[in-house]
């Protein structure tokens, strides 16, 4: 089947519930669509109250369609053919289209929408006229109003008529950025990229914070984390990757805290650092990939002891999921194979053999009195490095910037 499309008609998801803020949500979705299609300048993108229109102007429809399926805030979209707004020509194009898409025995229905109320026929008359032309040319065709094999949509707008027959499911959710900014604690594992994806789906613009402890962690581990962030850019546009120097803190913890408390105190320092970064960069929440009971630092007791260092809301999108459920999403978003590459992150290289599953807060506070907590956090935050990740080929196009640009 060869159909040359002129436009893609995009229908919004939950935006219909947003009342007075609807315009803001639509504008943000349009911005996100433009960002994921930025390397295709021939496209013309227009967003109006109830849908967006993407004029292809010769662009590769398959590539545009593939990218749109990953943009949050889209309920579905339909590739369309633009035809002159005259009944003889519309009928002619309907017949030509049916010759391409219709097979004997299939059922169909016509669904029309008349945005131009000066057009010669109203919606009901259009339905009848286009149904008749199908029957005249395909005598074996059968109408079925509920769940037909083919729904031919005709939309009469001011500039032209548009015909479509496919509804392609979108990613749903909310446009990225409409819920504000959050800071994702991105390790090299399976869970945190999934948490980032789920936060993006609910409209959170994420910046990825990764803790690096060279020489204990390798350049390969750092690149792996950046590659994971790059995988998420297909859902939310560019992502700022924030590398935190964590070696000094981890060495100090290892030297001055009991082995059973190494993980808890490490996570408390991480939470302090990411909270400071969040504050300086205008974030509203911290996001992590903790899943309840999966490891020692993810029991309710551990989470409570770790959370004590911040009043900032911490979102844990995968907290109630089984590992298999998390893996299923990781495979869907193409992060799983990256996540299982054998590079150790800073949580694994210093992991004690028997960490506390129910650490006492008073013990954590007592052990941290042996350390220069504020000084080390300050130095870590001052030493961060930023990388703007744009697409999966980020390492070929982007240069790192120092944190002076905060």
UniProtKB/Swiss-Prot annotation:
Cellular compartments per GO CC: cytosol
Recorded metabolic or biological pathway in which this protein acts:
Cofactor biosynthesis; thiamine diphosphate biosynthesis
THUMP domain ranges (all copies): 62-167
Q: Which UniProt keywords apply?
A: ATP-binding, Cytoplasm, Nucleotide-binding, RNA-binding, Thiamine biosynthesis, Transferase, tRNA-binding
User: Which catalytic reaction applies to this protein?
Assistant: [ThiI sulfur-carrier protein]-S-sulfanyl-L-cysteine + a uridine in tRNA + 2 reduced [2Fe-2S]-[ferredoxin] + ATP + H(+) = [ThiI sulfur-carrier protein]-L-cysteine + a 4-thiouridine in tRNA + 2 oxidized [2Fe-2S]-[ferredoxin] + AMP + diphosphate; [ThiS sulfur-carrier protein]-C-terminal Gly-Gly-AMP + S-sulfanyl-L-cysteinyl-[cysteine desulfurase] + AH2 = [ThiS sulfur-carrier protein]-C-terminal-Gly-aminoethanethioate + L-cysteinyl-[cysteine desulfurase] + A + AMP + 2 H(+)
Q: List the disulfide bonds.
A: none
Protein name, UniProt field: Probable tRNA sulfurtransferase
Entry binding sites for ATP: 185-186, 210-211, 267, 289, 298
Give the EC number(s) listed in the UniProt record.
Answer: 2.8.1.4
Annotated GO biological process: thiamine biosynthetic process; thiamine diphosphate biosynthetic process; thiazole biosynthetic process; tRNA 4-thiouridine biosynthesis
Q: What is the lineage of its organism?
A: Bacteria, Bacillati, Bacillota, Bacilli, Lactobacillales
- What is the superkingdom listed in this entry's lineage? Bacteria
The record's annotation in SUPFAM superfamilies points to: Adenine nucleotide alpha hydrolases-like (SSF52402), THUMP domain-like (SSF143437)
GO terms assigned for molecular function = ATP binding; CCA tRNA nucleotidyltransferase activity; tRNA binding; tRNA-uracil-4 sulfurtransferase activity
| Entry's localization field | Cytoplasm
Q: Give the family from UniProt.
A: Belongs to the ThiI family.
């Amino acid at each position: 089947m060869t159909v040359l499309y002129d436009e893609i008609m995009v229908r919004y998801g939950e935006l219909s519930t947003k009342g007075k803020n609807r315009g803001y949500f639509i504008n943000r979705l349009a911005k996100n669509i433009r960002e994921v299609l930025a390397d295709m300048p021939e496209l013309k993108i227009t967003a109006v109250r109830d849908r967006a229109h993407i004029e292809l102007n010769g662009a590769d429809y398959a590539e545009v369609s593939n990218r749109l399926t990953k943009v949050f805030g889209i309920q579905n979209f339909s590739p369309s053919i633009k035809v002159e707004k005259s009944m003889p020509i519309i009928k002619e194009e309907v017949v030509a289209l049916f010759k391409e898409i219709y097979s004997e025995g299939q059922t169909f229905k016509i669904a029309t929408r008349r945005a131009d109320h000066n057009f010669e026929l109203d919606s009901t008359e259009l339905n009848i006229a286009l149904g008749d032309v199908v029957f005249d040319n395909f005598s074996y065709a059968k109408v079925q109003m509920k769940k037909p094999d083919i729904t031919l949509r005709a939309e009469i707008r001011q500039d032209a008529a548009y015909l479509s027959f496919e509804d392609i499911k979108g990613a749903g959710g909310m446009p990225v950025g409409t819920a504000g900014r959050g800071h994702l604690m991105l390790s090299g594992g399976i869970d945190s990229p999934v948490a980032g994806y789920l936060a993006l789906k609910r409209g959170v613009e994420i910046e990825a914070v990764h803790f690096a402890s060279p020489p204990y962690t390798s350049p390969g581990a750092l690149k792996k984390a950046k590659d994971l962030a790059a995988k998420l850019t297909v859902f939310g546009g560019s992502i700022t990757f924030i590398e935190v120097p964590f070696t000094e803190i981890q060495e100090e913890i290892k030297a001055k805290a009991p082995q059973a408390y190494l993980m808890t105190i490490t996570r408390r320092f991480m939470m302090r650092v990411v909270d400071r970064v969040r504050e300086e960069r205008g974030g509203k929440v911290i996001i992590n990939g903790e899943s309840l009971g999966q490891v020692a630092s993810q029991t309710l007791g551990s989470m409570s002891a770790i959370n004590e260092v911040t009043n900032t809301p911490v979102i844990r999108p995968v907290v109630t999921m089984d590992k298999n459920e998390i893996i299923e999403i990781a495979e869907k978003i193409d992060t799983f194979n990256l996540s299982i590459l054998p590079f150790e992150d800073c949580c694994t290289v210093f992991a004690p053999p028997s960490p506390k599953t129910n650490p006492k807060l008073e013990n954590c506070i007592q052990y941290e009195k042996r350390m220069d907590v504020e000084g080390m956090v300050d130095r870590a935050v001052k030493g961060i490095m930023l990388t703007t990740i744009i697409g999966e080929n980020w390492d070929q196009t982007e240069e790192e910037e120092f944190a002076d640009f905060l």
